Amino acid sequence: LQEAKIGPMPVLPDVSRYQAPESVVPRNDLVQKAAQLLSTARSPAILAGRVSRSEAGWKARIALAERLQARVFTDIKTPAAFPTDHPLHAAPPATFPDGKLLRDADVVLSLDWVDTAGTLKAAWGDAPIGAKVIRVSVDAHIHRGWSADYQGLPPADAYLMCEPDVAVPLLLEAVRPRAAAVQSRPESSKDEDKAVSIRALARAFNELTEGMDVCLSKLPLGWNGAYRHFRHPLDYLGADGGGGVGAGPGLTVGAALALKGSGRMVVGIVGDGDFLMGNTALWTATHYKLPCLILVANNRSFYNDEMHQERVARERGRPVENKWIGQRIDEPDIDLAAMARAQGAAGIGPVKELSRLKPSLADALEYVKKGEVCVVDVRVMPGYDAPVSGGAASARR
């Protein structure tokens, strides 16, 4: 086929006959049932999950939350779905929502949330789910016996089998306003950074990008959702679907292609393992002139597996000191900045001192503003400031 001669051009079909179908609209009685549950709730909650990048959809979700005075939870695995600095945003986006806050709800509206069943189970444990549940999702289309890609089957007192962007305006029109006092949220920690950490990296980055339109294409596992606010549907694009290592650079370059010329700077904050497994995507970015910035939160380890190996060692009575074996990326050290330069990108680092962090990031931002690709190797302390397995934040090694 590759060597075959090209014959006459075929007649091109009328593409208007192959359009995507219109979104399904749920039955009115189901909308009214859901609206009644929400309107009469004592403490409604919204799980804002997989939604579109539409600004109209973003505004509709805000309007619905404000009309209901509902607490809103967002997921660090999915793209920005609600302004995280809004008074109704219950807690920083996380892999697992705050179970106590969720248990306070008597009605839960799940907007295509990833693993609603697992989230409710984590909040209520073995007890019956104490809240009425309204599901808005098209997940049931993939339910079958062959696989379990769709996670557990959650309870649903009303199921609107449509996309959230379709359901939210219908609910907004049908619900009655609720009067409720908005509870204040605890302030984020203002402790001074004493070493280069992911938190220090986030603070320096936030200061330097204040007022800029930035799209975060990827965040590392140790990122705490409180580190940066999301105020637009393109502020954050979510995590890779399966949690695989190596997606970060490619996701960043792909986002840079999609947003080229938009005025929004694409930034991927990735781990060193993620960068090492996918860094050849940089060549595509430099070849096609797709400006973007990759900040490598480099803890010199596949650290998530160090945590797993530590837990297994404790459970089996084995030496915890061996947790690094097969995971530590050291001896020899890898020059990540040189790997970037080898592909035509600017490479900065390794940045090991706190005093060099902000100037290095400032230089990197200037490269990207000039239309270049830049990578900064930031040597962060090992450890996570965010729970990644349903438990407490992980200790440093």
Where are each of the predicted segments found?
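A short alpha/beta connector and helix-capping loop motif
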Residues: 158-162, 279-299, 387-390
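Acidic, Ser/Thr-rich peripheral helices and adjacent loops at domain boundaries
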Residues: 307-332, 397
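Conformationally flexible catalytic loops at phosphate/diphosphate-handling active centers
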Residues: 1-40
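Phosphate/pyrophosphate-binding active-site segments
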Residues: 9-16, 32, 36, 130-219, ...
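A short, conserved beta-to-alpha structural element at the edge of catalytic cores
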Residues: 145, 289-318
